[in-house]
Amino acid sequence: MFISYEQTEKEAQLFLKKYHSDFSAPVPIERIVEIDLQISIVPIKGLLARESIDAFLSHDFTELYIDHDHYMGQTNRSRFTLAHEVGHYVLHRAVVAQITSIEQWRRFILGQGTGRAVYEIHADNFAGCLLMPRDQIRAEYEIQKKTVEDRFRAAGLEIPDKSTLLSFMANEIARKFDVSPKAAEIRLSKISP
C-alpha cells in the first residue's frame, strides 16, 4: 500500500484539526497520545539495544512502548518517535492490529522483502507533517529565509544554494517546533518552493 506525501500530509492535517485545532507549535504530542488517544506511554529500559526498535504500539492500541533512555533523554527525538507511532495508528491501523509480537514488529519495520518497509516512510512523513504543520512551517520558512539571506548580504557573502540555505534555517526552525534539525530540514525540503 503506497500513500503519497500529499495524502500523508492531508491525514496529518485532519488529525491535528481534531486533536490540536489551533495548530500552534510545538504540537503537544505526548498529551495527544496519552489524553486524547488514551494510549499509555511505557518506557522500557534497553528496548533499542535488545530489539533494535525505538518504539512500537500494542496491537490493541492501549500502549506505546518506547526505549527508556530515548524517551527520557532526547526530547525532540522522542517527540518525533511518538508522532511516528501515531502515524502508524492513523495510517496503518488494520496492519498494526495484527502484530502481536516484537518479532512481527521487526518484520513490519524492516519489510523482510514484503514491501512493508514503506510503512516506515509513511510514518516518518506523517510525523514530520504532524509536528510541523504545513501553514506554520511555510510561514516560519519565509521568516527564516529572509533572516538568513539578510545575514549573508550583511556579511557581503553570496546567498547560498537552496540546500545550504535549508541547512542554515533548520536549526532555528527545529527549536520552534521542538524537533531535530534533521527533521526540520527534511520537512523544509518538502514544502519549500
Regions found by a protein language model. Name each.
Residues 1-193:
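Active-site hotspot residues in diverse enzymes, especially metal/ion-binding acidic/histidine motifs
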